UniProtKB/Swiss-Prot annotation:
Any Pfam family matching the protein: Dala_Dala_lig_C
Gene Ontology molecular-function annotations: ATP binding; D-alanine-D-alanine ligase activity; metal ion binding
The protein's name: D-alanine--D-alanine ligase
SUPFAM superfamilies with a match to the protein in the record: Glutathione synthetase ATP-binding domain-like (SSF56059), PreATP-grasp domain (SSF52440)
Transmembrane segments: none
Top-level lineage group: Bacteria
Cofactor annotation comment: Binds 2 magnesium or manganese ions per subunit.
Organism: Bartonella quintana (strain Toulouse)
Pathway: Cell wall biogenesis; peptidoglycan biosynthesis
Residues annotated for Mg(2+) 2 binding in this entry: E267, N269
ATP-grasp domain ranges (all copies): 102-300
First-level EC class: ligase
Taxonomic classification: Bacteria, Pseudomonadati, Pseudomonadota, Alphaproteobacteria, Hyphomicrobiales
Amino acid sequence: MKGEHVAVLMGGGSSERSVSLSSGTACADILEARGYRVSRVDVDSHIASVLERLQPDVAFNALHGPFGEDGCIQGVLEYLKIPYTHSGVMASALAMDKGRAKIVVASVGVSVAPSCIMSRFAVGREHPMEPPYVIKPLCEGSSFGVVIVKENESAPPRNVVGAEWVYADEVIVEKYIPGREFTCAVLGNEALDVCEIFPDKHFQFYNYDSKYKSGGSLHICPAQLSPNIYQNVQRMSLAAHQAIGCRGVSRSDFRFNEETGELVWLEINTQPGMTPTSLFPDIAKASGRTYGDIVQWMVEDASCMR
């Protein structure tokens, strides 16, 4: 058994702290049940000295958001020469930047929505494109800060320039693609099943509450799609995973407009949530793998120089 002592890194100081704690706790429980010695580490600025003291065989990265999935913690682990799960420094940093990741993925022939990167203050002055469109913080996850500008809104959005905006000034603005929402996970070099997401009717879109509250969304896996579209989602997910340079696991999100036949890649997640309501465990189950199988596979796959 590789990595008998596993340090599960969780928590941290990002806006996704609670998600990370839930993911990390669930993964730590599984690893302990499978015979690993587990150290549960709530990450802070002293993480390097903590890891030097613990001397784990493997670091399981259950962090989400800045520092956890943007190449920072990966760089610390490379410096300490501790094998770790998920993607490496370069792929993590690139995937976290939604705009630049989209440029790279589009370069290998994956269809993406028209978009631009700009200052939130410029967005607040005038529409950057014809509504409807979506505004997202450039480097956040879990749908934090997402603003949907509807078709008939004449004035540009003001909530991106007010004091309530707690994210970076740079945002990505992309054309809103109506239709069905899908996600597909990649494990190693294999695209797993495609899952369709139905947010509860109380939510405008698949936002934070829809993702993490019990009953907030319905996951249909495998998705009911024509074989051609299903295979295209899998192909595009694997292409994005490889173009970004991901290792271990990733999950790509899509929109499909049945009226026009348009299938669009939205973004990639190099640290898919592993909470009880997360998509990745559901996809793994549909593919014939248990939650525990996936978590143990990640530990066995851990390495440096990723």
